[in-house]
Amino acid sequence: MFLPQEIIRKKRNGEALSTQEIQFFVQGITNNTIGEGQIAALAMAVYFKDMTMDERVALTCAMRDSGMVLNWEHLNLGGPIVDKHSTGGVGDVVSLMLGPMVAACGGFVPMISGRGLGHTGGTLDKLDAIPGYQTSVDNDRFLKVVKEAGVAIIGQTGDLAPADKRIYAVRDITATVESIAMITGSILSKKLASGLEALVMDVKVGSGAFMPTFEASEELAKSIVAVANGAGCRTSALLTDMNQVLASSAGNGVEVREAVRYLTGEYRNPRIHEVTMSLCAEMLISAHLASDDADARRKLQAVLDNGKAAEIFGRMVTGLGGPSDFMERYDSYLPKAAIVRPVYAANAGFVTAMDTRELGLAVVAMGGGRRAAGDKLDYAVGLTDFIRLGQSVDADKPLALIHAQTEDQFAQAASMVQAAVKIGDTQPQALPEVYRRIGLADL
């Protein structure tokens, strides 16, 4: 018999908790026998005293098992269950291309995604820009679309990792979000409840990243790789750059438009192409669908070239309630802003740095992201045709196109973009898209 307050005291004093103690506490969170005050106290104790890797594995597994864990065996899919998770950024529309590309190569991708958080865009908010697309469906519909299309991107259902929902809500209002142990548990409990065989983590680094420093990003990546493998899921991580907007656009509808153009071959921004290919290749290798990076990239390029990946995206959209001719007529289905105008730099020169976080907040300021949980979003607003680091700007070459609904919105976004993009006389060195890979051997 355990007492919640004794478990809290033990962690407060810096001792390691047993698997049984962690399971007891998480069960209490799930069945409401442990209150918000006790969750907050344990979260603060963990924030200050941390958790060993064994404790993190126990926490993740207990949170995963707090609800339903999807089982794919009865569907006889004939391919591996594999997924990707990103710590989020600005213009990070990778999931919309990656899911269909991996599915086209023989993987099955049951992707549980989130909404926008702070300055970062949410995959579900982007998909909400597609008329009729349902991000909230029951498990039967989810399984059916994954089986038929090979990929489905939906939101967390109430019966997947319910303990995480309660813990996260408390962490959010008690200044305990930044605990790497608890971030690890929160991310992985939801992902592992999807019944994955392999997972690839995309951990962002730079001015638009969730983690403030390269070292913190690396620490989170190592924690996730260690804990996920400890919980029985083959997992690796890539540290990728978020010192500039990743795609050419940032917003909801504008990013969906870019994803469709990428899949159909109409336009592929080279930076997001490299990040997408790197993550997809890592997934194919992890899922034993490719022998090495070169083999994986060959297969991925083939499904882009032959239209199979684009066709699968269309199938997923239709399966989740969207238009059956979305890929053919995407431009008429996606919302458009009243004002689309360029914003220019105050002086000519090279783009030397970007405050990517501030650029994300410019989209939020126009109504493309939330200030409060219940806010309704404007899916048409955003930024497109974004300048890249190292490129030159002048009176003819704008920083970006702003998609706004009013003149006031345009003016506010324009001044935020101008302040966030630094212009100098010397061209900076190019930054890599992918900094490093972290696998089990790197721990």
UniProtKB/Swiss-Prot annotation:
Pfam families: Glycos_trans_3N (PF02885), Glycos_transf_3 (PF00591), PYNP_C (PF07831). Gene3D superfamilies: Nucleoside phosphorylase/phosphoribosyltransferase catalytic domain, Pyrimidine nucleoside phosphorylase-like, C-terminal domain, Transferase, Pyrimidine Nucleoside Phosphorylase, Chain C. The keyword Metal-binding does not apply. The enzymes which catalyze the reversible phosphorolysis of pyrimidine nucleosides are involved in the degradation of these compounds and in their utilization as carbon and energy sources, or in the rescue of pyrimidine bases for nucleotide synthesis. SMART domains: PYNP_C. It is an enzyme of class 2 (transferase). Belongs to the thymidine/pyrimidine-nucleoside phosphorylase family. InterPro entries: Glycosyl_Trfase_fam3 (IPR000312), Glycosyl_Trfase_fam3_N_dom (IPR017459), Glycosyl_Trfase_fam3_N_dom_sf (IPR036320), Nuc_phospho_transferase (IPR035902), PYNP-like_C_sf (IPR036566), PYNP_C (IPR013102), Pyrmidine_PPas_bac/euk (IPR018090), Pyrmidine_PPase_CS (IPR017872). This is Thymidine phosphorylase. One of its GO terms (cellular component) is cytosol. GO terms for molecular function: 1,4-alpha-oligoglucan phosphorylase activity; thymidine phosphorylase activity. Keywords: Glycosyltransferase, Transferase. The keyword Glycosyltransferase applies. It catalyses: thymidine + phosphate = 2-deoxy-alpha-D-ribose 1-phosphate + thymine. Pathway: Pyrimidine metabolism; dTMP biosynthesis via salvage pathway; dTMP from thymine: step 1/2. Homodimer. Its EC number is 2.4.2.4. One of its GO terms (biological process) is thymidine metabolic process. It comes from the Bacteria. It comes from Aeromonas salmonicida (strain A449).
